[in-house]
Amino acid sequence: MVPTQVTIFSIIMYVLESLVIIVQSCTTVAVLFREWMHFQRLSPVETILISLGISHFCLQWTSMLYNFGTYSRPVLLFWKVSVVWEFMNILTFWLTSWLAVLYCVKVSSFTHPIFLWLRMKILKLVLWLILGALIASCLSIIPSVVKYHIQMELVTLDNLPKNNSLILRLQQFEWYFSNPLKMIGFGIPFFVFLASIILLTVSLVQHWVQMKHYSSSNSSLKAQFTVLKSLATFFTFFTSYFLTIVISFIGTVFDKKSWFWVCEAVIYGLVCIHFTSLMMSNPALKKALKLQFWSPEPS
């Protein structure tokens, strides 16, 4: 059982984190839209980032609506909101994975024909990657839609005995069909992300070793080391976010109801830090953040 003070603190942290994520999302979309209006084009990375900004904005509002709405109304009335939340979450996973793929293709020094072809075609492939993420997210939420329909059926069958064969079959269908497919829906984009990060790290380490061997300048080595540190931060927070989501879905390691707000505060704290690291990787967004939070006082 979680102390009341911890729950209240977690709720406050969750609200603050939600506000920060919403501001981050709006800033990302506004800055990159301004860049597009000015230059009439966006790079592949910026296209993914603006899509991530929109998905994070929708994800956070959906999360707040569901979390606070279920206090006043039964959870089943908000099943549609929870399905939208899951859709936006999986979409965010896919977009982050595609961002890792873009970084891998753009930065890595591999000369395999596949990498060379991707570097040439990546600008045309970005919109297809985003469309693929949308389609994959739609397919991934089908088990959840079925699950909530089953739960609503179970509510209507409350007058039947608990060991009724129909109820047991519906419960088994929910457990053996919905939960594993939900894990697959989150797992596939995460493993795409993982493979891209591993390949990029291997490439950067190889290049860093070569630069040290040929006595490159300290500034070049420092730049490579900075990229590796940024990559480690990117990997750490996204992996932590994925593991926290998985644990919250399983809900068997701890009392899910009493730890709910603690989990929410941890999950969206990780989202907030991870999104900040993504913004700092883009020069235009980094400049906007500095102007917003570290601008000098007018004389």
Curated annotation (Swiss-Prot):
Q: What else is known?
A: Several bitter taste receptors are expressed in a single taste receptor cell.
What family does the Swiss-Prot or TrEMBL record give for this protein?
Belongs to the G-protein coupled receptor T2R family.
- Superkingdom, natural source: Eukaryota
**Which residue spans traverse the membrane?**
6-26, 48-68, 83-103, 126-146, 184-204, 234-254, 259-279
Membrane protein topology class: Multi-pass membrane protein
User: Which ranges sit in the Cytoplasmic compartment?
Assistant: 27-47, 104-125, 205-233, 280-299
- The question of whether Transmembrane is a record keyword is answered with yes
Q: Gene Ontology terms, cellular component aspect?
A: endoplasmic reticulum; external side of plasma membrane; trans-Golgi network
Which organism is the protein's source?
Answer: Mus musculus
- Membrane topology, Extracellular segments: 1-5, 69-82, 147-183, 255-258
For this protein, the record's InterPro entries field holds:
TAS2R (IPR007960)
> What are the protein's UniProt keywords?
Cell membrane, G-protein coupled receptor, Glycoprotein, Membrane, Receptor, Sensory transduction, Taste, Transducer, Transmembrane, Transmembrane helix
**Self-association or partners: how does it assemble?**
Interacts with RTP3 and RTP4.
Full protein name: Taste receptor type 2 member 16
Could you tell me the Gene Ontology terms of the biological process aspect for this record?
Answer: detection of chemical stimulus involved in sensory perception of bitter taste
Any keyword Transcription regulation?
no
Subcellular localization: Cell membrane
Task: Name one molecular function that GO assigns to this entry.
Answer: bitter taste receptor activity
Known role: Gustducin-coupled receptor implicated in the perception of bitter compounds in the oral cavity and the gastrointestinal tract. Signals through PLCB2 and the calcium-regulated cation channel TRPM5.
Residues linked to a glycan: N163
